[in-house]
UniProtKB/Swiss-Prot annotation:
Pfam family, one: Cytochrom_B_C
Residues the record lists as binding a ubiquinone: 201
KW Membrane (keyword) present: yes
Protein name: Cytochrome b
GO cellular component: mitochondrial inner membrane; respiratory chain complex III
Annotated GO biological process: mitochondrial electron transport, ubiquinol to cytochrome c
Ranges annotated as spanning the membrane: 33-53, 77-98, 113-133, 178-198, 226-246, 288-308, 320-340, 347-367
Gene Ontology MF annotations: metal ion binding; ubiquinol-cytochrome-c reductase activity
Matching PROSITE patterns: CYTB_CTER, CYTB_NTER
Organism: Oreotragus oreotragus
Length: 379
């Protein structure tokens, strides 16, 4: 009798994706983050669903409905903080996942990579809209400042901003539509993630060496299912430590003050995972230039396959490129720190230098290092 998991139309898809999938025998823990992102997404959809049952998307009651969730709903506080801190874990996993792709040359799977970049944009948009929903001070002013950036677009800018706002300022219409989008987007992300996996399974996974692993494959189950479960346990442990001990560590105290259009907070800043892009935006004195730099800071990832000049795929055997990669990581951490600081000396100049360094590393220095390494191979 044939095994049902190999014959049943639905089970067959699951089997070919998670059980009998041929996987390289040498993929390290850096390959865990894909499955961790899947877990984060499921967690966010579930906690978000339960929050949506008690939340009201109205400017007069949004803030108090979040308070009501935390005070009166059974385990509402843990659902709310799991959702808020789950977003942080999601972005940590995302950055690790993208970093892994850059380090080991996974961007040469162009379709998979491009869908991944679209996923990154979609996740950032979702997180931004979610941050607006509690209708605290930082929610309101963050929404005002970030949506207002679109007014820098020539000719259609002002009309576009008013169209998104649904009026002449961030108000009830804005909150309602942001809630609608925030609810639907995770399902779009889930669909895109499936396309991402579909493209990945066309080629098979990359591995740390960057060399084809067709000659040495092992089944995904039990080897990598066990490995992924370990990663998942560590992720859930980290999330629970954050939620149960320091739930407000990554939040902004200003968001515990209800939104007030007449009172601007001293430092308007987004959540920590957007600070690197926010620092790049602020480091350019011109509004349109800043917006372009902001978009390009993420969109630049699409160019990486074209900027790959090395004869080797992975950075595993390329010390110069490795060095530049870790300088890029340090640069991004610097930008994240600067994004959270006030706009004054010396933070302005540090931010500008770090922004220049960011684009210089990706567009010029890393391709140059790869070319030098190619020449060294001839010696």
């Amino acid at each position: 009798m044939t095994n049902i998991r190999k014959t049943h139309p639905l089970m067959k898809i699951v089997n070919n994706a998670f059980i009998d999938l041929p996987a390289p025998s040498n993929i390290s823990s850096w390959w865990n983050f894909g499955s961790l992102l899947g877990i984060c997404l499921i967690l966010q959809i579930l906690t978000g669903l339960f929050l949506a049952m008690h939340y009201t998307a109205d400017t007069t009651t949004a803030f108090s409905s979040v308070t009501h969730i935390c005070r009166d709903v059974n385990y509402g506080w843990i659902i709310r903080y799991m959702h808020a801190n789950g977003a942080s874990m999601f972005f940590i996993c995302l950055f690790m996942h993208v970093g892994r792709g850059l380090y080991y040359g996974s961007y040469t799977f162009i379709e998979t990579w491009n869908i991944g970049v679209i996923l990154l944009f979609a996740t950032m948009a979702t997180a931004f809209m979610g941050y607006v929903l509690p209708w605290g001070q930082m929610s309101f002013w963050g929404a005002t400042v970030i949506t207002n950036l679109l007014s820098a677009i020539p000719y259609i800018g002002t009309n576009l901003v008013e169209w998104i706002w649904g009026g002449f300022s961030v108000d009830k219409a804005t909150l309602t539509r942001f809630f609608a989008f925030h609810f639907i987007f995770p399902f779009i992300i889930a669909a895109l993630a499936m396309v991402h996996l579909l493209f990945l399974h066309e080629t098979g996974s990359n591995n740390p060496t960057g060399i084809s692993s067709d000659t040495d494959k092992i089944p995904f189950h039990p080897y990598y299912t066990i490995k992924d479960i370990l990663g998942a346990l560590l992720l859930i442990l980290a999330l629970l430590l954050l939620v149960l001990f320091t739930p407000d560590l990554l939040g902004d105290p200003d968001n515990y003050t209800p939104a007030n259009p007449l009172n601007t907070p001293p430092h308007i800043k987004p959540e920590w995972y957007f600070l690197f892009a926010y620092a790049i935006l602020r480091s350019i004195p011109n509004k349109l230039g800043g917006v372009l730099a902001l978009v390009l800071s993420i969109l630049i990832l699409i160019l990486t396959p074209m900027l790959h000049t090395s004869k080797q795929r992975s950075m595993m055997f390329r010390p110069f490129s490795q060095c530049l990669f870790w300088i890029l990581v340090a640069d991004l951490l610097t930008l994240t720190w600067i994004g959270g600081q006030p706009v004054e000396h010396p933070y302005i100049i540090i931010g500008q230098l770090a922004s220049i360094m960011y684009f210089l590393l990706i567009l010029v220095l890393m391709p140059m290092a790869s070319t030098i390494e190619n020449n060294l191979l001839k010696w």
